[in-house]
């Protein structure tokens, strides 16, 4: 509610019919003013005027007080309508509203006074269908019908069935003009028909609380048989709706008023809105169709006796009460809370403010928009040629429909052809369709014919027809080609004929040339010879060829010089060649120059472009390099464009050269310049599908992109547009993509957007718009690459502390074993294996070591350990999915581990730990392992390999229990491994034992008498151990902050160089006597080991993986390293080296708060959309007992989203891999998704953080559910 105005009058009122209505008020009869003033006034108020300052625009005193006022619609002769007043003395007076407003003279505006009533006139109403007809009612049951056009004697509607003492309310039917209703103190409502001049219906109601005394009546705005009545009886304050087709009982009974109802008004603009007021000082809003109360407005201090909507502004209504106020307010409540209005801290100011501030506000039980704010039906064009329409069904519910809207099917046909051509990479169909259709102009026709020829013949033969069919040019003064008449005439006495014959022989081949053999006697010197000839002969006979050639050139004997130069050095040849071209400057010599130098630059730059075909043929003949060929062809095209001649001919010849020279930018610039002209011709053509400039623009752009894509296809050009002049092309492509997307061709638009450079302006927004409109995301399908056995890393020497670590199988001091070959070896992150400076590894005795390749995550291998459980657990296996039993084979026996705590109590003490349960799958029956034989250890002092087994024959002291549930786990987050992402063995099948001590901290060799039998070894392949709760091993990295949630790398195993690095929660092992300040201790981590005599049970047993088992421990030597020393080197403790101090790296605070998803980059959006969709899909399906795991998974996935939103932690490679995981998940290819997730943990262990386990669980739960 917004309180618009408040008028200090104890008055009845009437609204004008204007959009910004005036309000007429008249002092109400029967009320006592607070000042005991007995005067009566008629006022006009402009409540929407900002200048009136709460004063009426007109006010005049009248002799008597009013019971009611009515303001008619404008009708003939009354442009502002008539204002009628019902006085307490029985007079009905009429005023012309327009005259009253303009003259402000009450007497001048008065048009009639009716005195037909014998007592007070209590009510009156104008007919909504016949604006000049008025009905009045008053005491003694009198009802009169007035014709305000003629003001003749009023008529009566007929005889009442049961006369009443007083008529208090009359109302006209809004649909049928001769029907009205009346109500009074008789307790009933009468329905009158003026045509039959009688009362036709009689409505009354007796309820459980008594008989209703109908005091007011109102008709349905549009339905002629429905009306509503209200009772002013305090014992039965009801509002009743009636349908006259069943007048025996009301349709709806609405209760809410605590005392009698005095006024009703049914909104003419919305049948679902009714306002009422009454003796309980309240004003209420109802939905009479549903019979429910919508809300209640602030109460008044006395009876609210009259309320009414403004006829032309139904959002506004007024309520008059006996407390001397008329409140004008709006239906909607937009006022601020009272607490914001009264905000003073001072007590005195508070009471002053609260006494002058409205502290009441309306209370709405049901929120309902009025009809004028509703849109019963709407329609809108959407991006992508979509038409969205909204309409209501019979129940009033909105129905939204989205339909395809195509205005021009001709355009759709061309876009479909383009789409098919892209899919098949065959644009020949487009060329054929263009050649078969009608061309706009000859230029366009020539382009497509040229593209057809280029498609059919290729660029190599593009000029054959032109050159072969043209006449060869002739040199001035030269006759036609001479025939070869024999060897003696091969060389003539003239230089020109010599070169002609030389060229002829070159052209015809030398196979028919007769070799010259000198015959007969001759003299070397002759008296007739000149001195120059004699000198030349001497030089030749002395084989002084250089001087001989120079002598020939001095004597202008060019032919002789050429003969001498044939078998001479390149310098001599070049000297003779230059001398020839300096003396000959004719056309043939220029051509010979280009041919002899194997360079057509002179021809391309200076030859007459009228012979452009011959120039093009020379380029094809002499330019073997592709780049040089394209450059010369483009240069020739430029010369043709700049030359004189017919414009169309030049253009076509230049395009031919550009097409041959791959000058796409040059071709496109010509086609783009011609677009406006083509659009004009299309508009002037008789093509039915071209009716607007936008149609012509689309058709011209379509023709352009078809030419471009066809040429690219013919020339085998793929990928994005490249080059310095691609901007105009890209703009045209982007515009065309926008247009075809507007026609709903999203796939075609995306194809064209892929041709644009990724950094092109406007590409990102256009692509986002198309993706949102199509409701799809583009995720490039990735392939999982694997390395074969031949690509495995080579084993390195254990003594090399900085060598590349390699996966090895565990080895014992007696010999090695062989593992099943694998097809996939996950890459290893050397950074995670590197030892820090200042903490070197001592020489290690390393017995026989055999490399064990990592297991292929896509191939299930059989176990070869007889003591391995029937269903060995893989660190990345799905605990929700039933496992496939593996075949077992008998091998050498192993010594069993010591017995642990009972299973049940162990489970209870570790309930609620971080790992996923294994209870979604049916439990498989365990297999009994083969019996084992115990063999003594040949080297009791050497470290042995501890393995898991179902039973243990030896007896050992009880091990420490897992941490209790009551202890907070926040202190040991870093000691709990949620995944073995950093381990170089993470893709191998894991053997585990529920009762084995943690790896890396197993007990030292026991003293005699403690164990019944020493441990034994086996040659069977044993997968590397893994303990999810073992202390974390992390490589020191000064550039990356430590993440307490990151999955720590597992401890080393024999045969692998492992650094000994202190972690934030693990005390560093002491080396010798050197001591360093250790980080805070982890209450659940094993205590630091002793280099001299480690205690057998120094470390407690961590909690097992829920639903899984704990991996067996690796051996621990008595030295500081867990690895045995290499052979030949005594096992002595090395010099103590202090471990490096922990490097602290301050983490930068995130750029955006957690939960914000508005800044996720475009390349990461597919990950967010895909994982969110999958997460929302499986969360409702998670059983209640695993709800905690679902919540943890959701939290971790959202942490991944936070990293994506802040563009931190994750590299581009990780994001690309995550996209592939999402693609596999959407395709329900869970093995591939799991393998890809493993690769992320392997290749980017420093980026996995605390989100990686969430993705792992999401894959597992998606597969199980």
Swiss-Prot record:
Residues 462-490, 786-1163 are annotated as: Disordered. Coiled coil: none annotated. The keyword Amino-acid biosynthesis does not apply. Keywords: Cytoplasmic vesicle, Endoplasmic reticulum, ER-Golgi transport, Membrane, Protein transport, Repeat, Transport, WD repeat. Residues 927-936, 1129-1142 have a biased composition (Low complexity). Transmembrane segments: none annotated. Residues 861-878, 968-993 have a biased composition (Polar residues). WD repeats lie at residues 5-46, 61-105, 116-156, 162-202, 209-252, 256-296, 299-339, 380-403. One of its GO terms (biological process) is protein transport. Residues 1080-1089 have a biased composition (Pro residues). GO terms for molecular function: structural molecule activity. It is a peripheral membrane protein. Residues 473-486 have a biased composition (Basic and acidic residues). It holds the Pfam family WD40. The keyword Manganese does not apply. GO terms for cellular component: COPII vesicle coat; endoplasmic reticulum exit site; endoplasmic reticulum membrane. It is found in: Cytoplasmic vesicle, COPII-coated vesicle membrane; Endoplasmic reticulum membrane. The COPII coat is composed of at least 5 proteins: the SEC23/24 complex, the SEC13/31 complex, and the protein SAR1. SEC13 and SEC31 make a 2:2 tetramer that forms the edge element of the COPII outer coat. The tetramer self-assembles in multiple copies to form the complete polyhedral cage. Interacts (via WD 8) with SEC13. Belongs to the WD repeat SEC31 family. Component of the coat protein complex II (COPII) which promotes the formation of transport vesicles from the endoplasmic reticulum (ER). The coat has two main functions, the physical deformation of the endoplasmic reticulum membrane into vesicles and the selection of cargo molecules. This is Protein transport protein SEC31. It comes from Debaryomyces hansenii (strain ATCC 36239 / CBS 767 / BCRC 21394 / JCM 1990 / NBRC 0083 / IGC 2968) (Yeast).
């Amino acid at each position: 509610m917004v309180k618009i105005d408040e008028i200090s009058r104890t008055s009845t009122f009437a609204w004008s019919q204007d959009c910004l209505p005036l309000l007429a008020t008249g002092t109400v009869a029967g009320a006592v003013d607070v000042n005991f003033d007995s005067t009566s006034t008629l006022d006009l108020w402009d409540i929407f005027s900002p200048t009136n300052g709460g004063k009426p625009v007109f006010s005049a005193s009248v002799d008597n007080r009013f019971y009611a006022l009515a303001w008619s619609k404008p009708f003939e002769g009354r442009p502002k309508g008539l204002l009628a007043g019902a006085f307490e003395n029985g007079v009905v007076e009429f005023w012309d509203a327009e005259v009253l407003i303009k003259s402000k003279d009450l007497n001048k505006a008065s048009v009639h006074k009716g005195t037909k009533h014998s007592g007070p006139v209590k009510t009156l109403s104008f007919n909504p269908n016949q604006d000049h007809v008025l009905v009045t009612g008053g005491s003694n049951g009198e009802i009169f019908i007035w014709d305000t056009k003629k003001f003749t004697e009023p008529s009566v509607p007929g005889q009442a069935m049961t006369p009443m003492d007083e008529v208090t309310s009359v109302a006209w039917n809004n649909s049928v003009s001769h029907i009205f209703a009346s109500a009074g103190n008789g307790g009933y409502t009468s329905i009158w028909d003026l045509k039959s001049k009688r009362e036709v219906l009689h409505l009354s109601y007796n309820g459980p609380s008594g008989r209703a005394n109908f005091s007011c009546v109102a008709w349905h705005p549009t339905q002629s048989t429905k009306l509503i009545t209200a009772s002013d009886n305090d014992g039965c304050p009801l509002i009743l709706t009636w349908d006259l087709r069943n007048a025996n009982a009301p349709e709806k009974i609405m209760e809410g008023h605590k005392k009698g109802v005095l006024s009703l008004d049914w909104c003419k603009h919305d049948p679902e809105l009714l306002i009422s007021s009454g003796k309980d000082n309240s004003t209420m809003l109802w939905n009479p169709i549903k019979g429910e109360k919508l809300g209640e407005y602030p109460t008044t201090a006395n009876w609210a006796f009259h309320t009414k909507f403004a006829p032309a502004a139904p959002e506004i209504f007024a309520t008059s009460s006996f407390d001397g106020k008329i409140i004008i307010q709006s239906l909607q409540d937009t006022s601020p809370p009272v607490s914001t209005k009264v905000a003073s801290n001072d007590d005195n100011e508070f009471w002053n403010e609260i006494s002058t501030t409205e502290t009441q506000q309306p209370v709405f039980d049901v929120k309902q928009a009025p009809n004028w704010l509703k849109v019963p039906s709407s329609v809108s064009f959407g991006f992508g040629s979509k038409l969205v329409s909204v309409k209501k069904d019979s129940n009033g519910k909105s129905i939204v429909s989205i339909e395809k809207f195509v205005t021009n099917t001709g355009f759709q046909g061309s876009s479909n052809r383009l789409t098919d051509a892209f899919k098949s990479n065959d644009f020949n169909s487009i060329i054929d369709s263009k050649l078969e259709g009608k061309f706009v102009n000859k230029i366009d026709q020539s382009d497509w014919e040229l593209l057809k020829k280029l498609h059919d013949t290729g660029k190599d033969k593009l000029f054959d027809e032109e050159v072969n069919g043209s006449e060869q040019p002739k040199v001035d003064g030269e006759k036609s080609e001479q025939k070869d008449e024999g060897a003696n005439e091969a060389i003539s006495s003239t230089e020109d004929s010599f070169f002609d014959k030389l060229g002829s022989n070159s052209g015809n081949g030398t196979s028919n040339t007769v070799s010259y053999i000198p015959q007969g006697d001759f003299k070397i010197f002759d008296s007739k010879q000149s001195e120059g000839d004699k000198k030349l002969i001497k030089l030749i006979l002395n084989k002084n060829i250089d001087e001989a050639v120079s002598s020939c050139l001095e004597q202008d004997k060019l032919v002789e010089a050429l003969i001498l130069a044939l078998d001479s050095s390149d310098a001599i040849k070049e000297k003779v060649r230059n001398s020839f071209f300096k003396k000959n400057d004719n056309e043939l010599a220029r051509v010979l120059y280009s041919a002899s130098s194997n360079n057509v630059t002179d021809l391309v730059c200076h030859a007459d472009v009228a012979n452009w075909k011959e120039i093009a043929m020379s380029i094809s003949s002499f330019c073997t390099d592709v780049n040089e060929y394209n450059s010369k062809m483009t240069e020739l095209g430029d010369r043709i464009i700049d030359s004189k001649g017919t414009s169309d001919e030049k253009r076509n010849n230049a395009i031919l050269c550009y097409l041959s020279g791959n000058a796409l930018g040059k071709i496109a610039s010509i086609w783009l310049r011609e677009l406006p002209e083509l659009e004009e011709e299309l508009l002037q053509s008789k093509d039915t599908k071209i009716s607007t400039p936008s149609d012509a623009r689309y058709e011209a752009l379509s023709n352009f992109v078809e030419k471009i894509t066809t040429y690219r296809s013919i020339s085998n050009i793929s990928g994005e547009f490249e080059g310095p002049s691609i901007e105009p092309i890209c703009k045209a492509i982007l515009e065309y993509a926008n247009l075809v997307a507007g026609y709903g061709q999203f796939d075609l638009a995306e194809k064209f957007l892929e041709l644009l450079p990724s950094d092109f302006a406007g590409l990102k927004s256009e692509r986002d718009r198309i993706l949102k409109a199509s409701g799809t995301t583009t995720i490039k399908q990735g392939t999982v690459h694997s390395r074969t056995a031949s690509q495995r890393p080579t084993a390195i020497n254990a003594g090399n502390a900085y060598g590349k670590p390699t996966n090895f199988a565990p080895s014992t001091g007696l010999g090695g074993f062989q593992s099943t070959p694998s097809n996939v070896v996950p890459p290893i992150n050397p950074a995670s294996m590197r030892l820090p400076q200042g903490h070197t590894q001592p020489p290690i005795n390393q017995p026989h070591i055999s490399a064990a390749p990592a297991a292929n995550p896509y191939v299930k291998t059989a176990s070869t350990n007889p003591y391995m459980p029937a269903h060995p657990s893989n660190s990345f296996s799905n605990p929700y999915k039933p496992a496939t039993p593996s075949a077992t084979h008998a091998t050498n026996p192993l010594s069993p581990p010591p017995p642990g705590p009972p299973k049940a109590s162990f489970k209870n003490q570790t309930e609620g730990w971080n790992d996923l349960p294994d209870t979604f799958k049916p439990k498989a029956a365990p297999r009994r392992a083969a019996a084992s034989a115990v063999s003594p250890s040949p080297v009791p002092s050497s470290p042995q390999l501890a393995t898991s087994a179902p039973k243990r024959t030896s007896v050992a002291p009880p091990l420490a229990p897992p941490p209790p549930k009551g202890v907070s786990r926040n202190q040991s987050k870093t000691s709990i491994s949620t995944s073995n992402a950093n381990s170089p063995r993470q893709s191998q099948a894991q053997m585990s034992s529920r009762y084995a001590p943690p790896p890396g901290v197993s007990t030292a060799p026991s003293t005699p008498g403690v164990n019944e039998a020493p441990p034994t070894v086996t040659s069977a392949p044993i997968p590397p151990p893994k303990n999810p709760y073992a202390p974390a091993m992390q490589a020191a990295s000064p550039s990356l902050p430590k993440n307490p949630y990151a999955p720590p790398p597992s401890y080393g195993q024999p045969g692998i160089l492992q650094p000994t690095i202190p972690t934030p929660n693990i005390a560093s092992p002491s080396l010798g006597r050197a001591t360093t300040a250790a980080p805070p201790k982890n209450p659940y981590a094993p205590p630091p080991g002793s280099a001299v005599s480690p205690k057998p049970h120094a470390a407690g047993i961590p909690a097992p993986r829920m639903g899984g088992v704990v991996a067996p421990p690796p051996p621990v030597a008595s030295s500081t390293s867990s690895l045995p020393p290499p052979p030949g080197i005594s096992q002595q403790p090395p010099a103590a080296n202090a471990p490096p101090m922990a490097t602290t790296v301050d983490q930068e605070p995130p750029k955006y708060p957690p939960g914000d998803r508005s800044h996720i980059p475009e390349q990461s959006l597919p990950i967010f959309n895909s994982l969110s969709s999958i997460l929302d899909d499986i969360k409702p399906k998670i059983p209640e007992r695993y709800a905690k795991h679902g919540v943890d998974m959701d939290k971790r996935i959202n942490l991944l989203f936070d990293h994506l939103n802040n563009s931190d932690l994750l590299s581009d490679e990780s994001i690309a891999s995550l996209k592939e995981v999402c693609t596999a998940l959407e395709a329900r290819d869970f093995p591939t998704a799991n393998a890809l997730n493993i690769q992320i943990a392997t290749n980017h262990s420093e980026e996995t953080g605390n989100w990686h386990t969430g993705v792992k669980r999401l894959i597992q739960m998606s597969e199980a559910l």
